[in-house]
């Protein structure tokens, strides 16, 4: 597999206001540490020096986060107004995200909704991790929903695994990793929430990839679909043997459903933004003072006030 480098930056969407890049695995988005030789911020500065904004700390406005170990679609706003419009889509839960993953074992149910509440793990030595409600040391668990669809069964380095599509309907820290682990099907290569097994106890990466992203802002519909990295031609350790659901059909479902417009209650200017078949996306709760303060802090360096 091609290693990450400053020159190796894949752009999958570009407009006047936004970029969507296909982040490499094991690359941080940004870092204040001088020893961090490779970050997405440095890749962007190398590729698009003219787009860097000296008024922001990192030069670029990242609309959301991806874990260090996770690859895939990540959106960058190119001006403060675009950053604000993207934030409002995230706040109103109008963003559609879908991930691909290889998980341990053969998942038997072809579709399921995972609904374990997730909270912070206060157990000594695990304070930077999350856990499901009922786990000893689980603090302030919050409702969490993930849709899972099984795509393929196969083997990874000789061990049974399943390739799945995951759609988070809420946005908890490490939600997909925690939910898969709670099912007994941890993500291959997840050394925090998974279990080392046999010959594959040190995989070259965590097998979680942000595959699809849609942000229906009022000005444009930012939509990107990244290449599937979990195919035998790219990773000889992965050997699928049973197809359960074609990925292309699920992408069509994601793209075809109407996008709800919260201001009018009807279809918005972009589509879609609805989950895969299942119980549906929970309605967004009213914005709290804490959330509003977080928004103001998030936007402060761009001097943009959120709508009242």
Swiss-Prot record:
Disordered: region residues: 257-292
Catalytic residues of the enzyme: 67
A Gene Ontology BP annotation from the UniProt entry: enzyme-directed rRNA pseudouridine synthesis
Gene3D superfamilies cross-referenced by the UniProt entry: Pseudouridine synthase (3.30.2350.10)
InterPro entries: PsdUridine_synth_cat_dom_sf, PsdUridine_synth_RsuA/RluA, RluA_PseudoU_synthase
GO molecular function: pseudouridine synthase activity; RNA binding
Modified residues (N-acetylmethionine): 1
Family: Belongs to the pseudouridine synthase RluA family.
Identification of the protein by name: RNA pseudouridylate synthase domain-containing protein 1
Gene: RPUSD1
């Amino acid at each position: 597999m091609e290693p990450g480098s400053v020159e190796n930056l894949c752009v999958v969407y570009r407009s006047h206001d936004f970029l969507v890049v296909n982040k490499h695995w094991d690359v941080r988005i940004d870092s204040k540490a001088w020893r961090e030789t490779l970050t997405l911020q440095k890749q962007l500065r190398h590729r698009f020096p003219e787009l860097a904004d000296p008024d922001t700390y990192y030069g670029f406005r990242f609309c959301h986060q991806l874990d260090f170990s996770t690859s895939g679609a990540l959106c960058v706003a190119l001006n403060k107004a675009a950053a604000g419009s993207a934030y409002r889509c995230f706040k109103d839960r109008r963003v559609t995200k879908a991930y691909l993953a290889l998980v341990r074992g053969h998942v038997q149910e072809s579709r399921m909704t995972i609904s374990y509440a997730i909270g912070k793990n206060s157990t000594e030595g695990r304070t930077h991790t999350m856990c499901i409600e009922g786990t000893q040391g689980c603090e302030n668990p919050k409702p969490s929903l993930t849709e899972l669809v099984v795509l393929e069964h196969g083997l990874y380095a000789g061990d049974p695994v399943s390739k799945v599509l995951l759609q988070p309907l809420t946005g908890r820290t490490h939600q997909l990793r925690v939910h898969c682990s709670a099912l007994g099907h941890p993500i291959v290569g997840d050394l925090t929430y998974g279990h080392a097994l046999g010959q594959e106890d040190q995989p070259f990466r965590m097998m979680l990839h942000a595959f699809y992203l849609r942000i229906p802002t009022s000005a444009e519909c930012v939509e990107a679909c990244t290449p599937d990295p979990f195919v035998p031609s790219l990773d000889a350790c992965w050997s699928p043997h049973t197809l359960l659901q074609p990925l292309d059909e699920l992408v069509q479902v994601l793209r075809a459903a109407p996008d709800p417009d919260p201001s009018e209650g009807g279809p918005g200017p972009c589509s879609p933004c609805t989950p895969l078949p299942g119980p549906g996306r929970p309605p967004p709760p009213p914005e709290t003072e804490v959330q509003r303060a977080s928004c103001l802090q998030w936007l402060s360096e761009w001097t943009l006030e959120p709508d009242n």
